[in-house]
Amino acid sequence: MSLHQFLLEPITCHAWNRDRTQIALSPNNHEVHIYKKNGSQWTKAHELKEHNGHITGIDWAPKSDRIVTCGADRNAYVWSQKDGIWKPTLVILRINRAATFVKWSPLENKFAVGSGARLISVCYFESENDWWVSKHIKKPIRSTVLSLDWHPNNVLLAAGSCDFKCRVFSAYIKEVDEKPASTPWGSKMPFGQLMSEFGGSGTGGWVHGVSFSASGNRLAWVSHDSTVSVADASKSVQVSTLRTEFLPLLSVSFVSENSVVAAGHDCCPMLFNYDDRGCLTFVSKLDVPKQSIQRNMSAMERFRNMDKRATTEDRNTALETLHQNSITQVSIYEVDKQDCRKFCTTGIDGAMTIWDFKTLESSIQGLRIM
């Protein structure tokens, strides 16, 4: 595991370029900083300044090498690099509340933006007018959209929101998409069609993170009531929900067709397994804490603790986990959702950690990525 402390401020969100030599992140303000890897060091290469509100989402398209950002100023920008300089293009989102999340589609010909306006803007490039325009998915969303993920077919879109529900919509746009083939989620896919809806029957919480599996047949989401859920469209949309004993999880990603990594307020990534029988189980925490050493205190330390912390005990305030505060985002670092070898986490502590499954499997007894 490699940990890099980028900032003292929280990292709101991040995105990697195609070959993982650069990372774009927001230091909890209206800027995007792009860091470049030089040996074992990360050096700041660019600062993207166009937003005038907090940046809430970043995504970097691997093939076209374009960055999309969205923010609390209700705007989104598509950034393209020309002669080593990143130039922004404004996107017409048509929203009256903050944008909360942004994600490129797999073919990179459109992207989706969630917002506090209780809608999703699906944006595509209109070449005759030379600008990015959007279509809105509104019904039946009743609250802020917190998270989005695209199905591999480039048409279906999963959305988690503050009305305690996780939904799958069709984001088919005839101007840029070919007619989609039938999927286990459904066959008729006009724009805005609600394909599936989960949660919200008296229980649940805000849906913080959603993730399709590599096949697109499974959908995982994490909610503020400390639950992890997986829906399997190939098993007539059977839902398995696991109520965990942990603090709420904020981000989730499939790392194989049967394995899910999630992380959040416990400052530690966790591995869950979903087997072919439809059973969802907790496997292990992936951050193995070092054993704390008991030691005797001097009288001087005892009095200092009484003065500073109103206690006579030697309480170390550092957490045993690598991250010292909540993890806000999990992303795939090496390979893909089908066969992830390494994944990355960033958090409120301003740190970025890269986790290697091979190293984890050797240090955690019985750990295997299925």
Swiss-Prot record:
Gene3D superfamilies: YVTN repeat-like/Quinoprotein amine dehydrogenase (2.130.10.10). One of its GO terms (biological process) is Arp2/3 complex-mediated actin nucleation. WD repeats lie at residues 6-45, 50-89, 140-179, 202-241, 244-284, 322-365. Its main location: cytoplasm. Keywords: Actin-binding, Cytoplasm, Cytoskeleton, Nucleus, Repeat, WD repeat. Belongs to the WD repeat ARPC1 family. This is Actin-related protein 2/3 complex subunit 1A. It comes from Mus musculus.
